[in-house]
UniProtKB/Swiss-Prot annotation:
Its job: Required for the formation of a threonylcarbamoyl group on adenosine at position 37 (t(6)A37) in tRNAs that read codons beginning with adenine. Is involved in the transfer of the threonylcarbamoyl moiety of threonylcarbamoyl-AMP (TC-AMP) to the N6 group of A37, together with TsaE and TsaB. TsaD likely plays a direct catalytic role in this reaction.
PROSITE patterns: GLYCOPROTEASE
Tagged with keyword Transcription regulation: no
Residues annotated for Fe cation binding in this entry: H115, H119, D309
Gene symbol of the encoding locus: tsaD
Name of the protein in its database record: tRNA N6-adenosine threonylcarbamoyltransferase
UniProt subcellular location: Cytoplasm
GO molecular function: iron ion binding; N(6)-L-threonylcarbamoyladenine synthase activity
GO cellular component: cytoplasm
Taxonomic lineage: Bacteria, Pseudomonadati, Pseudomonadota, Alphaproteobacteria, Hyphomicrobiales
Gene3D superfamilies: 3.30.420.40
Species assigned in the record: Nitrobacter hamburgensis (strain DSM 10229 / NCIMB 13809 / X14)
């Protein structure tokens, strides 16, 4: 089957065509991504209205390029998939409305894809991976540990109770005066820094649940930076190194607990899988290798270009759902919030947070 995928949930405008074979293997025929980094850099972060307008301006051309590169005409499509959330609602509306128009005109099935599900299923696009497996999803908006039991069948084992991991990296970068996007800047600065200079907290370490918390660590970095005047490049490197080291240790601890919870409830996972933009961080990849080795499980991380937001992951999730007989009507709503695990609740004691969304 051939599926067109459209991604517009944040600041990447993307479209792709993916072919799913009868045996479950896949071939990416095209994958066009246009980042809006230049549009948002002057503001130090994503501006929702600017993002939505950029999607409007670029999406038609990107879809045309993806279709041309794939060599597939619209009549040959088995389905058209769009990220229907969670995300910035203006952008979600742009992508989903476009997909509905294509589905209507060409009488093609519509698949409204949960953006998080697309990340969760990406490892099956790049590897011959069977269910169940344990997913570590870390991005600018989400940090979760999820049991992936099948297409449409997910159980959240842990989540952040405050900041998402990518969000924390970006905020630390901004407070230290590093350019946007901040995550890669922090990683580069940390490589030249002394991680032992500052004794930053390791949040949630040793707790029996698998939840994350990063706001306290972020505040600790701000406090240390505020004591240094002037803030020199060496200081920035050391602060970034200390911050990243704390994140790595906390992540390893939280994932260790998450894997234990997975085994208790679902048996041995076929793999530990990482997805989301933060999974492109090489230091975090190294920490995940250690976690997988200690847990005696295989580690699978898609290529960096498929960890960040892209159209191929949406097309693939659409193909997986289509193969399972899961399609949507033209009434499918755009969603700013959309839980991957519909039965998930906020962690105990954190009912008033945005945890898990």
């Amino acid at each position: 089957m051939l599926v067109l995928g459209i991604e517009t949930t944040c600041d990447e405008t993307a479209a792709a065509v993916v072919e799913r074979h009868a045996d479950g293997s896949a071939l990416i025929l095209s994958n066009i991504v246009r980042s809006q980094t230049g549009e948002h850099a002057p503001y130090g972060g994503v501006v929702p209205e600017i993002a939505a307008r950029a999607h409007v301006d670029m999406l038609d051309g990107i879809i045309a390029s993806a279709m041309k590169q794939s060599g597939v005409g619209f009549p040959r499509l088995s389905g058209v998939a769009a990220a229907a959330g969670p995300g910035l609602i203006g952008g979600v509306i742009v992508g989903l409305t476009t997909a509905k128009a294509i589905a209507l005109v060409h009488r093609t099935p519509l698949i409204a894809v949960n953006h998080l599900e697309a990340h969760a299923l990406t490892p099956r696009l790049t590897s011959a991976l069977e269910f169940p497996y344990c997913l570590f999803l870390a991005s600018g908006g989400h940090t979760q540990i999820v049991a992936v039991l099948g297409v449409g069948n997910y159980v959240r084992l842990g989540t952040t109770v405050d900041d998402a991991m990518g969000e924390a990296f970006d905020k630390v970068a901004k407070m230290l005066g590093l350019p946007y996007p901040g995550g890669p800047q922090v990683e580069r600065a940390a490589a030249d820094g002394d991680a032992k200079r500052f004794n930053f907290p390791r949040p949630m370490l040793g707790r029996p649940d698998a939840n994350f918390s990063l706001s306290g660590l972020k505040t600790a970095v701000r406090n240390e930076a505020g004591r240094i005047d002037p803030l020199r490049p060496r200081d920035i490197n050391d602060l970034c190194a200390g911050f990243q080291a704390a994140v790595l240790e906390a992540t390893a601890d939280r994932l260790g607990v998450g894997l234990e919870l997975f085994r208790e409830r679902f048996g041995t996972p076929r793999a530990l899988v990482a997805a989301g933009g933060v999974a492109a961080n090489q230091a975090i990849r190294g920490a995940l290798e250690g976690v997988a080795a200690r847990a005696q499980t295989m580690l699978i991380i898609p290529p960096p270009a498929l960890c960040t937001d892209n159209g191929a992951m949406i097309a693939w999730a659409g193909a997986e759902r289509l193969a399972a007989g899961l399609t949507d009507t033209l009434e499918a709503p755009p969603r700013a919030r959309w839980l991957l695990d519909a039965n998930a609740h906020a962690p105990a004691g954190f009912a008033n947070t945005r945890a898990g969304f």
